[in-house]
Amino acid sequence: HKYLQDRDSLVDAETNIYTKREGEDITVRCYLTFSGSRKLLCKETCEEGNILIDTYRDEDQRGRYSIKYEHRYIRSSILDVTITKLTKSDSGLYRCELQKDWCPDSEDNFKIIVTEGEFNPQNHEDISIQPFRKSTFKE
């Protein structure tokens, strides 16, 4: 089974990437294939030391990290992940995971890139989304 060997590159291709500036908050929605009682939010992998949240509750918070779980349908649920006051060290790969005794684990990955530049809500203007026009620079 080739796709098992290429699993890492497969995950890579499907990983959503979010870019934010230092100081901003972010909420990312993880889509999971079944409902599960144990919810985990991890950095990189869900190994000891990488687990940010490990809970059986539908809503939980640990410091700057919080999750909100919603069971949608028999084979579908969502986990909203919020990280507040982002820092450069928050950049990286994250994993949402649902665990159930008699089911395989369900997981979703996302990547955050935190760019430099203090976020200031008062004068925040995202110039990156404005089209470049020469007429802006009239003499």
Q: Which stretches of residues belong to each language-model region?
A:
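N-terminal edge beta-strand
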Residues: 2-28
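Non-cytosolic beta-sheet module surface loops
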Residues: 30-34, 85
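N-terminal V-set
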Residues: 33-66
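Short, structured motif recognition centered on aromatic/hydrophobic residues
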Residues: 41, 65, 77-83
